[in-house]
Regions:
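Conserved catalytic or regulatory cores that recognize and/or transform ribose-phosphate-containing ligands
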Residues: 1-145
Length: 145
């Protein structure tokens, strides 16, 4: 199964977490497209946009990291783009709770677009990789919706 790993990538801590998670998932037999490691030859907004959009199109599933007080805007767009095409797995290891009671930890458009939700407050990157792998194996067919 080919996964597009969406998530914030603007700090060294975020990039390091993403890289560790991708390596662990690959060790579990998952092919991972990690945007931060797929730099286009031309480093401009259009090239990055096209590269990431194409990465989503070539993947079977989008796994989106939803940590932080509010999910990353680029990650939210990637989920919206993928929604009508393929399953989405939302992952949150952040113990901070956003949202309102009964509406989920973030915007309802994200909450309701997900095929699988993984909530693992305080989880290590190893625990997170295992939970994502379990979720991916529970998705019977990665065919478009």
């Amino acid at each position: 199964m080919k996964v597009y790993l969406a998530g914030p990538l603007f700090s060294s801590a975020e990039r390091s977490w993403n890289e560790k998670l991708a390596v662990l998932l690959e060790g579990l037999g998952v092919e991972v497209f990690l945007p931060q490691t797929q730099e286009p030859q031309e480093r401009n907004a259009r090239a990055v946009f096209q590269k990431d959009r194409d990465g989503i199109d070539r993947s079977d599933v989008v796994v989106a990291i939803m940590d932080g007080p509010d999910p990353d805007s680029g990650t939210c767009w990637e989920c919206g783009y993928a929604y009508g095409k393929k399953p989405i797995v939302l992952v949150r290891t952040d113990f901070r709770r956003g949202g309102r009671p009964g509406l989920g930890p973030y915007n309802a458009m994200l909450t309701e677009s997900a095929t699988v939700h993984i909530e693992l407050p305080f989880a290590s990157v190893e625990e997170t990789a295992t939970a994502i792998h379990r979720a991916l194996t529970s998705i019977k067919s990665p065919a478009p919706r």
